[in-house]
Regions:
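Extracellular glycan-modifying ectodomains
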Residues: 1-195
């Protein structure tokens, strides 16, 4: 198991689903702090919106639960909360702390950050990567960062390819969300960057 103590980057999940945080936090012990995109569903467009607008509209306007597939879900414009009861004030406060921690980490200049995202099979969110990079550079100009973007997209159209050396885009050969695949991919990306 790799540990954050032996690695020079802060590793941070930016969604799109719970498995990314589960791999980084539980299976690899790479992230000891909770951040806002851990254990929620989020669109990449939403991540970009939240970064650009200080997390405006992160929570559903009216936190009314929907009971579906054995889960109590809260639907926002760019988010779905499956594991958190947003009707509980302490849960909302915990997310607000995560947001402050996340923004504070991005504003510091000390540690580089590796953002990790997994994207679903139905459309190619990777085409939004240039906008994400632009927003990060605009809002946090001193931040040194990389992005590992793992996509389950299986469409026939041309796949996104980045020319930015700090952006790693990997199209996975399956629609299945498999944590073991993430474990391997994250391990490969950080393997050569130990402190």
């Amino acid at each position: 198991m790799m540990n954050i103590e032996t690695h020079n980057e802060k590793i941070v999940s930016i969604g799109g689903w719970c498995g990314v945080a589960a791999v980084l936090r539980k299976k690899m012990a790479l992230c000891q702090e909770a951040f806002p995109f851990d254990y929620i569903l989020s669109s990449f467009e939403g991540v970009i919106h939240f970064l650009r607008n200080d997390f405006d509209a992160f929570f559903p306007e009216k936190p009314v639960p929907c009971f579906e597939d054995g889960f109590t879900k809260f639907f926002g414009r760019h988010t779905i909360f499956l594991h958190h009861d947003l009707q509980e004030p302490e849960v909302v406060e915990a997310f607000k702390r995560r947001i402050r921690r996340f923004l504070s980490m991005l504003a510091q200049e000390k540690s580089p950050v590796l953002f990790v995202r997994a994207s679903g099979p139905y459309f190619d969110e990777a085409h939004n990567i240039p906008e994400f990079v632009s927003v990060i550079r605009e809002r946090f100009p001193a931040l040194k960062f990389r992005l590992l973007f793992m996509s389950h997209y299986q469409g026939e159209d041309e796949k996104f390819q980045s020319t930015d050396e700090n952006v790693i885009v990997q199209y996975l050969g399956t629609e299945e969300f498999r944590e073991d695949e993430y474990l391997t991919r994250v391990g490969e990306v950080i393997g050569g960057n130990r402190g």
